[in-house]
Amino acid sequence: MEQEYHSEVFDIRRVSENDKELFREVAKAEYLFGRLYDVEPDIGLKVYWESMTEDDTEINYSVFLKNGDLLGRVALQGIDNKFPELAIIIVKQYQGQGYGELLLKEWLNWICTTMGYHRINIRIDSSNTRSIKLFQKLKAIVDREEYIIYCHLDLPME
């Protein structure tokens, strides 16, 4: 299985131990862990990093822009399931600039081609308006709505 994806905009590779300090900005931008990070940055990073790297059913990727800046993280969670779940975090410096939509279109098509997944599940906290807007743009199909919005994307994407 290919471990890296490169395009005109992104360099994406599996997360490595060398990324831990870089992931401070990712932990800060993460919707739930970011709240802990704001109070106790070192503990927030430690908990975030451990939760991300110790789960054998996740594949985590570091996303870099071509200038070398860390853009964020994308992940497949529950890879042992028929339909894995998507996680995406864009660092605050780059939020709201269209990177999330472009990243997901490129990366999810690569995931479809290299891993054979044709559907990705998504859970969004109903108060996370930024994520809701992103997945509306991507035409995510809503399966059910509660305080969590459960939806999915069919792959490949257009």
Model-derived features: positions:
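C-terminal "cap" of GNAT-fold acetyltransferases
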Residues: I141-E158
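Active-site acidic-Proline motif in GNAT/NAT acetyltransferases
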Residues: V91-Q93, Q97, S126-S127
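Acetyl-CoA-dependent GNAT
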Residues: G34-E85, V91, P156
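Conserved GNAT acetyl-CoA-binding A-motif
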Residues: F83, T113-I124
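Conserved active-site alpha-helix within GNAT-family acetyltransferase domains
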Residues: E101, S126-R144
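Hydrophobic adenine-recognition pocket in adenosine-nucleotide-binding enzymes
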Residues: V15, I90, I124
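Conserved acetyl-CoA pyrophosphate-binding loop and the N-cap/start of the following alpha-helix
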Residues: Y94, G98-E106
